[in-house]
């Protein structure tokens, strides 16, 4: 398996798909990177030469924010929202949906499992 910026990418998949295994790179960005490097998008990842891997590593570290740096930036943005007590920050802190979704029903993914409440005795 070829290693790109410290992450193993699958070697039997097309290069266009293999690059999407890196955090922060989707199909569109993957195609953009392949065009910049002048590689064939249909080529399998295990056919990359050492020179191609070096160029790919150089491009990813210099021009794009991926993997650990991107994760760190997202976490810092969320911490900043929480610290300034913005509405979005409060929703993050309370573990509720942040982008205006309804919460009377649904939103179980964000809230977690149901907490059952016992009925009052008469």
Curated annotation (Swiss-Prot):
<protein>
    <recommendedName>
        <fullName>Small ribosomal subunit protein uS13</fullName>
    </recommendedName>
</protein>
<dbReference type="InterPro" id="IPR027437">
    <property type="entry name" value="Rbsml_uS13_C"/>
</dbReference>
<dbReference type="InterPro" id="IPR001892">
    <property type="entry name" value="Ribosomal_uS13"/>
</dbReference>
<comment type="similarity">
    <text>Belongs to the universal ribosomal protein uS13 family.</text>
</comment>
<dbReference type="InterPro" id="IPR018269">
    <property type="entry name" value="Ribosomal_uS13_CS"/>
</dbReference>
<dbReference type="GO" id="GO:0019843">
    <property type="term" value="F:rRNA binding"/>
</dbReference>
<dbReference type="GO" id="GO:0003735">
    <property type="term" value="F:structural constituent of ribosome"/>
</dbReference>
<comment type="function">
    <text>Located at the top of the head of the 30S subunit, it contacts several helices of the 16S rRNA. In the 70S ribosome it contacts the 23S rRNA (bridge B1a) and protein L5 of the 50S subunit (bridge B1b), connecting the 2 subunits; these bridges are implicated in subunit movement. Contacts the tRNAs in the A and P-sites.</text>
</comment>
<dbReference type="GO" id="GO:0005829">
    <property type="term" value="C:cytosol"/>
</dbReference>
<keyword id="KW-0699">rRNA-binding</keyword>
<comment type="subunit">
    <text>Part of the 30S ribosomal subunit. Forms a loose heterodimer with protein S19. Forms two bridges to the 50S subunit in the 70S ribosome.</text>
</comment>
<dbReference type="InterPro" id="IPR019980">
    <property type="entry name" value="Ribosomal_uS13_bac-type"/>
</dbReference>
<dbReference type="GO" id="GO:0006412">
    <property type="term" value="P:translation"/>
</dbReference>
<dbReference type="InterPro" id="IPR010979">
    <property type="entry name" value="Ribosomal_uS13-like_H2TH"/>
</dbReference>
<feature type="compositionally biased region" description="Basic residues">
    <location>
        <begin position="101"/>
        <end position="122"/>
    </location>
</feature>
<keyword id="KW-0689">Ribosomal protein</keyword>
<keyword id="KW-0820">tRNA-binding</keyword>
<dbReference type="GO" id="GO:0015935">
    <property type="term" value="C:small ribosomal subunit"/>
</dbReference>
<keyword id="KW-0694">RNA-binding</keyword>
<dbReference type="GO" id="GO:0000049">
    <property type="term" value="F:tRNA binding"/>
</dbReference>
<dbReference type="Pfam" id="PF00416">
    <property type="entry name" value="Ribosomal_S13"/>
</dbReference>
<feature type="region of interest" description="Disordered">
    <location>
        <begin position="95"/>
        <end position="122"/>
    </location>
</feature>
<keyword id="KW-0687">Ribonucleoprotein</keyword>
């Amino acid at each position: 398996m070829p290693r790109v910026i410290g992450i193993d990418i699958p070697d039997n998949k097309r290069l266009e798909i293999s690059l999407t295994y890196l955090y922060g790179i989707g199909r569109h960005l993957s195609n953009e990177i392949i065009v910049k490097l002048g590689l064939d998008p249909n080529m399998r990842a295990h056919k990359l030469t050492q020179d191609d891997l070096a160029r790919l590593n150089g491009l990813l570290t210099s021009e794009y924010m991926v993997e650990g740096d991107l994760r760190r930036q997202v976490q810092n943005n969320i911490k900043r929202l929480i610290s300034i007590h913005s509405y979005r920050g409060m929703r993050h802190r309370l573990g509720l949906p942040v982008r205006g979704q309804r919460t009377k029903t649904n939103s179980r993914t964000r809230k977690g499992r149901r907490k059952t409440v016992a009925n009052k005795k008469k």
